[in-house]
């Protein structure tokens, strides 16, 4: 089997929405199986005014990131679909739908979205280095979305793999001064290994068991603070993608953002994404090696405050 692994039951030609689920990994592996309080003139704290979307939040304002900036921030999407033959990687069909849906979802949250297709390792590093060197003083946060093949700790450019940390560390507090104390969000759709999640039966599942497939630079803070990494899967495992419908993780993320992105805190959003991916998706294939597999996303947060868009 070449390219990504496949997994959706059908016969003959498949429609765009009924194509096989695939994984973002090497073919040879898969074959082996809040706003801050403001000071009044008298020195008393003035609570920030609440919009209709957040007036029912019971949160201490100083524990929320300040989003009261001219811009929400920049969102960079790197969408790698086609790879050089030397990488041994197949075409990531379905990723264009992911990129398009992500662009719409993040624009609706107020981000300035920029999408870059089929970038080499050097291109990705240059692109994000330039972004880190920009002046983000008028922005509340920064987001980056990587859509590609991957392995644990690695993301693939069109010409091969590179360490994810070589991209993310460009935005550390000691390198990107204008994002100090502001949330830096990374969403990564890629495999992190070659294991399959077989899933397990539970007696406490949902009733319907049908499965488808601020910154405040006056304080000294750690350089690694205020990062959030949302991975499509846990370390060591495959990440599934359908060539017609897009990836399980990205489509679930977009769905939750579209419905709750302006009401819920970021960890609430991502917890719901975890639930949707874990309960609503299961791979199906005529090949039993790739059938009835599951997936659970993984969130790694170094955020120091609550984040509401």
From Swiss-Prot:
Residues 192-201 are annotated as: Loop L2. GO terms for cellular component: cytoplasm; cytosol; extracellular space; nucleus. Keywords: Allosteric enzyme, Apoptosis, Cytoplasm, Hydrolase, Nucleus, Protease, RNA-binding, Secreted, Thiol protease, Zymogen. Transmembrane segments: none annotated. GO terms for molecular function: aspartic-type endopeptidase activity; cysteine-type endopeptidase activity; RNA binding. The gene is CASP7. The active site is at residues 149, 191. The keyword Cell membrane does not apply. The record marks 192, 231 as: Involved in allosteric regulation. It is an enzyme of class 3 (hydrolase). This is Caspase-7. It comes from the Eukaryota. It comes from Gallus gallus. It catalyses: Strict requirement for an Asp residue at position P1 and has a preferred cleavage sequence of Asp-Glu-Val-Asp-|-. Heterotetramer that consists of two anti-parallel arranged heterodimers, each one formed by a 20 kDa (p20) and a 11 kDa (p11) subunit. Cleavage by different proteases, such as granzyme B (GZMB), caspase-1 (CASP1), caspase-8 (CASP8) or caspase-9 (CASP9) generate the two active subunits. Its involvement in different programmed cell death processes is probably specified by the protease that activates CASP7. Cleaved and activated by initiator caspases (CASP8 and/or CASP9), leading to execution phase of apoptosis. Cleavage and maturation by GZMB regulates granzyme-mediated programmed cell death. Cleaved and activated by CASP1 in response to bacterial infection. Residues 1-24, 204-214 form a propeptide. Its main location: cytoplasm.
